[in-house]
């Protein structure tokens, strides 16, 4: 059975970098998928779905639920690794519920933990506006992305706390410290 770890955090929290490094350090057993990267890759293909994704992401809005869930489940099931890290999901209560429903309806994947990389809004803003990855990284869009992240956060945290799978990690430290703590935590579940 595959072990799933969801890594959430504000734009600029470092969640993608953290997950990439953990997967790289444990390449035999851990696969990492960034929801953002999966959606950007689809968008770059300029397919009908890709253009639809681009329409939403260029405005800092959420991509429709069915496209996101389909993309994530496809990535999990096609992976040959036993531990799967997915960052940037869930970003809404609806995404959380849709994934929970799908996970409950099968026995190939078990959700082990939801890890939130916590950073202040100022840190997130400095990191995002400093990296300028694309057209979606300007200040107005940052504030929209921050709102989209914060609006459902309390409900998402409570849902996973009630399931006893929520863990918060301080994202204001060095990458080495964050990755070290997160990796140790993930590996503590065994195989």
UniProtKB/Swiss-Prot annotation:
Q: Which positions are annotated as binding AMP?
A: 35, 40, 61-63, 88-91, 95, 133, 145
* Statement: the UniProt record of this protein carries the keyword Kinase: yes
Q: In which pathway does it act?
A: Purine metabolism; AMP biosynthesis via salvage pathway; AMP from ADP: step 1/1
Q: Which Pfam families match?
A: ADK
Coiled-coil boundaries: none
Q: Where does the record place the region NMP?
A: 34-63
Where does it reside?
Cytoplasm
Respond yes or no to whether keyword Cytoplasm is given for this record. Answer: yes
Main subcellular location: cytoplasm
Query: A single GO BP annotation from the record?
Result: AMP salvage
Record-linked CDD domains: ADK
Q: Which PROSITE patterns match?
A: ADENYLATE_KINASE
Catalyzed reactions: AMP + ATP = 2 ADP
EC numbers listed for it are: 2.7.4.3
What molecular functions are annotated in GO for this chain? adenylate kinase activity; ATP binding; nucleoside diphosphate kinase activity
Q: Per UniProt, which keywords does this protein have?
A: ATP-binding, Cytoplasm, Kinase, Nucleotide biosynthesis, Nucleotide-binding, Transferase
* Binding-site residues, ATP: 12-17, 131, 173
Superkingdom, natural source: Bacteria
- How is this protein annotated for GO cellular component? cytoplasm; cytosol
**Enzyme class at the top of the EC tree:** transferase
Function field: Catalyzes the reversible transfer of the terminal phosphate group between ATP and AMP. Plays an important role in cellular energy homeostasis and in adenine nucleotide metabolism.
What family, per the record? Belongs to the adenylate kinase family.
Domain commentary: Consists of three domains, a large central CORE domain and two small peripheral domains, NMPbind and LID, which undergo movements during catalysis. The LID domain closes over the site of phosphoryl transfer upon ATP binding. Assembling and dissambling the active center during each catalytic cycle provides an effective means to prevent ATP hydrolysis.
Q: Which HAMAP family match?
A: Adenylate_kinase_Adk
How does this chain assemble? Monomer.
Under what name is this protein listed? Answer: Adenylate kinase
């Amino acid at each position: 059975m595959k072990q799933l770890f969801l890594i959430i955090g504000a734009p600029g929290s470092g969640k993608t970098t953290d997950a990439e490094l953990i997967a790289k350090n444990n390449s035999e057993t851990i696969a990492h998928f960034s929801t953002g990267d999966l959606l950007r890759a689809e968008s770059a293909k300029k397919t009908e779905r890709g253009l639809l994704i681009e329409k939403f992401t260029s405005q800092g809005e959420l991509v429709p639920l069915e496209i996101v869930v389909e993309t994530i489940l496809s990535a999990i099931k096609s992976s040959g690794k036993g531990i799967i890290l997915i960052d940037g999901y869930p970003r809404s209560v609806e995404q959380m519920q849709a994934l929970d429903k799908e996970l409950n309806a099968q026995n190939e994947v078990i959700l082990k933990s939801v890890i939130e990389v916590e950073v202040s809004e100022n840190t997130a803003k400095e990191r995002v506006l400093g990296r300028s990855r694309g057209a979606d990284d300007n200040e107005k869009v940052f504030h929209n992305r921050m709102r989209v992240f914060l609006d459902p956060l309390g409900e998402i945290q409570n849902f996973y706390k009630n399931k006893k799978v929520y863990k918060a990690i301080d994202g204001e430290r060095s990458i080495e410290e964050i990755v070290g703590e997160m990796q140790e935590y993930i590996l503590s579940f065994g195989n």
